[in-house]
Every structure is written in C-alpha cells, then in structure tokens.
Amino acid sequence: MHNFLISILLLSSLFTSADEFSVMTLNAQNLFDIKDDPKKDDKAYLPIELKQSERHINSCKNIRVKSWKNECLYLDWDEDTKNAKLKNLANEIIKYDEVGPDILALQEVENLNILTQLFKLIQPYGYKDLTLIEGKDYRGIDTALITKFKILDSKLHYISFTGKNENKDTR
C-alpha cells in the first residue's frame, strides 16, 4: 500500500497546478455490501435472513474468536446498517477541510460495488475518480483510492514476505 500510495501521489502532483494537495488514509473497518460473494469471506456481513442455512451456521461455528463467531451468526448487516456505515464514513471524510481531502486512501473495502456507493455520497465535494486494488487478503478485502484527480492507472505491487516472521496476507 505504501509504494502504491507514493506512486499515486507522484502521478497526481504532475497533473495539478495547485501548490498543495491533501491526503487522507482511512481504515473503513470492514466496508462490505449486503450481497453474499462466494469469492470473499463476507459471511459476517450479510442480512440475517441469509444466515439461517445449516451450511452458514456450521461455517460460523468453526470461528475461534467468540466475538467474530457471534457477528457471523447474529449480526444483521442489512441495507439500513450498511447505509448508516456509508453515511458515517462520508461524514468523517468530508469533515476534513469541510470538503474532504484531495486523495483518499481506504483500507478494508470489500469490492467495487460498495466503493462506488461511498463515492456517490462524496462525489458532490469534487471527487472525480476511484479505483479498487484487488489484493491477496484471505478475507477478500482490498484497498482503494478515491480522488479529486483523474487516475491514469492503478497496479498492485506485491511484496513477498518470507522467513520465520512470514504471515498470511491481510488488508
């Protein structure tokens, strides 16, 4: 993410006549839509009616952390809950300078669908472009940029970690 952000900042600075631009990084803390995506580990972030199958319940029972297991089983991630999260995020973003930062880097975004929903909420403040970078996080959550500049290209620069401190990829 660090190299990615630096690349975007350098490219953006070439195309702006302003002396300054602002950057905000924000962990969206599990920004999920309400659709079940079989390619993502989104089982905690679904409407309660999608959590009633035996398959879902058994999958949740394999979760070791009690609070995560309870979210998987009982959290009702419905349209109202998702919209409240989007509204709260948009309000936090716009608080910066009353119009939001020029470049917004987000972590923990599920997919382009939910990113686009956030983008539409803050677009009236001058935002012009967005990109989602599909990573290798085991849960399937990704990083994203929303910017007041046009994005020319985006690319994941994967860094492989090896050795005794090797961990699985996360957001």
Where do the language-model regions lie?
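Sec-dependent N-terminal signal peptides
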Residues: 4-16
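A generic structural micro-environment signature
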Residues: 7-10, 34-38, 115, 152, ...
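N-terminal, active-site-proximal structural segment of metallo-dependent hydrolase catalytic domains
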Residues: 15-121, 132-138
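Structured beta-strand-rich core segments of catalytic domains in phosphoester-bond hydrolases
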Residues: 109-171
